[in-house]
A protein has these predicted regions:
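An acidic helix/loop motif centered on a single conserved Asp/Glu
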Residues: 54-63
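Charged, solvent-exposed interaction patches on well-folded alpha/beta domains
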Residues: 1-44, 64-73, 77-88, 93-277
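Extracytoplasmic "Venus flytrap"
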Residues: 48-49
């Protein structure tokens, strides 16, 4: 008798619990379906490292497209489409958009990191990021790193924005040659950016000899942050060995002759350094 009563009570308890859970889930689902968006919360996850994008800018993107989000039912907001919309902005590396039970539409994103700025004589002014994306110059943003000047042969027009590798394997010989040189030049600047000494030392990379014949890349010069020296690196090929040669020169010759021993240093030729006072 007691055992039968216990079983009955257990069944009744589980039945009531199932009814409660079913009602609760239906109520929660209906409530979520009818819940309105009360806030768009934008979080730039790497804002401490760089500030190309602010929450206000993201909200302005939505406003410019006349997206009425606040006051709209959360269930009717296409979060995947919003993610695609945010990712299409050049400075955005990753984006995640989702809703929460507190009535918020959450936008979380990270930014691309520019590693080099081009400001050339032939009218180009843009950034290249660490993941190989070409971005336009931004008025109020500062990138701490070498600026590339001179006359640089590019595989694209001055207003291009997008991935650099779009030009890889281009069948047009001139485009492919310019792309190959640009990649080598960017890799050189990345190397400088990754080395504490050279990053502090080199402030400008100047491209010269852009009229080099077929099969030859332009020469490059580097300008130190301090002093009046100009250093001819020559071809960008073999830059690690050339910089090692320059460092050895500074450690030995400059130690005896002084920093201003020469105004022009030429590293272009193998196994020698040519200096002009």
């Amino acid at each position: 008798m007691k055992r039968s009563l216990v079983i009955t009570l257990n069944l009744l308890t589980w039945t009531l619990l199932a009814v409660y859970l079913s009602f609760s889930l239906r109520y929660t689902s209906q409530r979520k379906k009818e819940q309105l968006c009360r806030e768009v919360r934008v979080t730039v996850l790497d804002s401490a490292e760089r500030n190309f994008i602010t929450p206000a800018m993201v909200r302005a993107w939505f406003a410019a497209e006349k997206m009425k989000l606040v006051g709209t039912e959360l269930s009717s907001i296409n979060t995947l489409e919003l993610e695609r919309f945010v990712r299409r902005r050049g400075f955005v590396r990753t984006a995640r958009v989702y809703t929460s039970m507190d009535g918020r539409l959450n936008v979380e994103l990270t930014q691309r990191r520019p590693v080099v700025r081009f400001n050339t004589q032939n009218g180009y002014n843009f950034y290249v990021t660490d993941d190989g994306y070409v971005l336009p110059q931004q008025r109020y943003f500062v990138v701490y790193g070498p600026v590339v000047t001179g006359y640089v042969p590019f595989p694209f027009k001055p207003d291009y924005v997008g991935p650099l590798d779009r030009f890889a394997g281009n069948p047009e010989k001139k485009v492919q040659k310019n792309y190959s040189f640009l990649v080598k030049l960017i890799n050189f600047v990345k190397f400088v950016d990754s080395d504490d000494f050279w990053k502090a030392f080199i402030v400008q990379v100047h491209v010269v000899g852009s009229q080099a014949g077929d099969g030859y890349d332009p020469d490059i010069e580097i300008v130190p942050r301090a002093g009046d020296q100009v250093i001819m690196l020559g071809s960008v090929d073999g830059y690690e060995q050339k910089l090692a040669k320059l460092l050895s020169f500074y450690r030995h010759a400059v130690a005896y002759e002084g920093w201003n021993c020469c105004s022009y240093i030429n590293l272009k030729y193998k196994d020698q350094i040519v200096c002009i006072e």
